[in-house]
């Protein structure tokens, strides 16, 4: 992001297990096109983690099968359409979770 680097706390983990070890009590929702569960059907809680894959391939199968994953969820799309890009998908999901939490900390 252009001028947002000072607002981000970026940590690069060596692997998915190391990442998950930093959030031991969090529920983890994996966003994938390969499920029938929609993202807005989740009752999000403070501390939940949202996992997204890259635009080309999504989340790798071995990560989707990880025992720490709480549920696979998807953002509905119109038939015969490609997917939204990662930024738009993350924005839709994060704002839904934040909305459910009453826009906690917002102005």
Roles of regions detected by a PLM:
Residues 1-33, 91-94, 98-106:
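RNA substrate-binding interface of SAM-dependent RNA methyltransferases
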Residues 16-20, 36-37, 80-83:
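A short acidic, often aromatic-flanked loop/helix-cap motif at beta-alpha or helix-coil junctions
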Residues 33-37, 54-57, 79:
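Short glycine-rich anion-binding loops that position phosphate/pyrophosphate groups of nucleotides
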Residues 40-43:
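Adenylate-forming
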Residues 47-48:
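A contiguous loop/helix-start segment that scaffolds small-molecule binding in enzyme catalytic cores
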Residues 59-64:
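Short, glycine/polar-rich helix-capping loops at beta-to-alpha or helix-loop-helix junctions
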